[in-house]
Amino acid sequence: IIGDEINGAITTADNIAGKIGII
């Protein structure tokens, strides 16, 4: 499902940003 893929990408970006310390 396209929506799920978009949500997954946002979640992944959020996780990466969190690990780097941006968020």
Swiss-Prot record:
Localization per Swiss-Prot or TrEMBL: Secreted
Domain of life according to the entry: Eukaryota
CC terms in the record's Gene Ontology section: extracellular region
Tissues where this protein is expressed: Expressed in skin glands.
Function: May act as an antimicrobial peptide.
Residue ranges crossing the lipid bilayer per the database entry: none
Stated name of the protein: Septenin 2b
Protein keywords: Secreted
Entry annotated with the keyword ATP-binding: no
Recorded family membership: Belongs to the Frog skin active peptide (FSAP) family. Septenin subfamily.
